């Protein structure tokens, strides 16, 4: 009898991707985050679908429809907070996943890496538009400030902003289109994930040593399915602790005030996962310069393969590069902290220094350290 798992047109794709997939025998728990991101995406799509059943994308009723979900819908509060904190879990896993790629040199798989960068931009756009939907004060003013950045683009900026707004200010048309995009983008993300995996399975996974693992592979199931399951349980524990004990910990109290175009909140700031980029944006006094720095702070990931000077792929045996990597990590924590602080001395200076350090480390210091390590190893 032929094995249906290996011969059925649909099942053999699943089989070759998640069951009989040859995987390196030494990949650590840092490789868990890909599957956790898949779980986060599934959670966001499911909870989002249930929220969309009760939400109305209209400026007059959006805020009260979210209130209605929390108060009147059966377990609506759980669905709403799972969705809100699920986004935080998503970005936490994303940042660790990217950090793992940088540390172990996974960016040398260029197609997978580039699709990953497109995925990052798409997820950020989706999260930004989702934050606008409850139509609280921070939703409205966040949308106004961030979309207004496009007006810095020469010649077409103002027209572009009004085109996105669907009028002369953030209003009903803006909310409706943001809801439409927020609904469709996760499915586009799911399609991009398939492309990401397609390219990954063309080359095979990297491993902590950064060497070829062709001579030593093990099947993905049961070894890595059970390992991923442990990661999933731990992530679920963290997510449910947040949702059930402190659901508003990562949110902004201002978003519990309905949007009012006539009253500006004292400090306009995005969710925690955008704060590092927001700090870089604010550290440059010029509007266009700030926007370019903001975009380049993420787009810089695309040129990292070109900046890789070391002869070794991974940082496992490169202690100097490890120091630089952890300094970069600490710098990102500082930028995240600064992004949530008011614009005043000495915080402005700290933000500017941290922004300079961020770009210097990636563009100058780390490539130089790679060359120094080559020299030390007489390579």
UniProtKB/Swiss-Prot annotation:
The chain crosses the membrane at residues 33-53, 77-98, 113-133, 178-198, 226-246, 288-308, 320-340, 347-367. One of its GO terms (biological process) is mitochondrial electron transport, ubiquinol to cytochrome c. GO terms for molecular function: metal ion binding; ubiquinol-cytochrome-c reductase activity. It is a multi-pass membrane protein. It is found in: Mitochondrion inner membrane. Heme b b566 binds at residues 97, 196. Keywords: Electron transport, Heme, Iron, Membrane, Metal-binding, Mitochondrion, Mitochondrion inner membrane, Respiratory chain, Transmembrane, Transmembrane helix, Transport, Ubiquinone. GO terms for cellular component: mitochondrial inner membrane; respiratory chain complex III. Binds 2 heme b groups non-covalently. A ubiquinone binds at residue 201. PROSITE patterns: CYTB_CTER, CYTB_NTER. The cytochrome bc1 complex contains 11 subunits: 3 respiratory subunits (MT-CYB, CYC1 and UQCRFS1), 2 core proteins (UQCRC1 and UQCRC2) and 6 low-molecular weight proteins (UQCRH/QCR6, UQCRB/QCR7, UQCRQ/QCR8, UQCR10/QCR9, UQCR11/QCR10 and a cleavage product of UQCRFS1). This cytochrome bc1 complex then forms a dimer. This is Cytochrome b. It comes from Hapalemur aureus.
